[in-house]
Amino acid sequence: MSAIKDDERSHTLVRPRPQTVIGKDTARDITDMMIAAVKDGEAKWTRLPGLTVAGKTGTAQIPDQGKYQENKTIASFVGFAPAEDPRFTMLVVLWEPQTSQWGSETAAPLWFDIARDLVYLLRL
């Protein structure tokens, strides 16, 4: 499809050309580091049975009137699986989580809950 047309208007669709942002070796290195973060790091319990998960936790302080306050954070977890041939990628971001300030304790568990359902739905 190259355009959308109706009786009054026509819109040409522009398809961006794919671009290589990082090389294959760099992508593999980053994936390996993300696999290690799940296997041996803060996000150990985001592992899914029978699948290799690549992921990374994140915790950032939110500035408040020019200063950072320890209890105001953004917690996150990004991951994809299976790492060798991803079928899904997901980012979970929580602003000012209440139970813990850390992405490994808040965003990662939520990611795991959703990922477990995706594994079932996608029959991985």
Spans of model-derived segments:
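Short surface loop/edge beta-strand patches of beta-sandwich-type extracellular domains
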Residues: 16-24
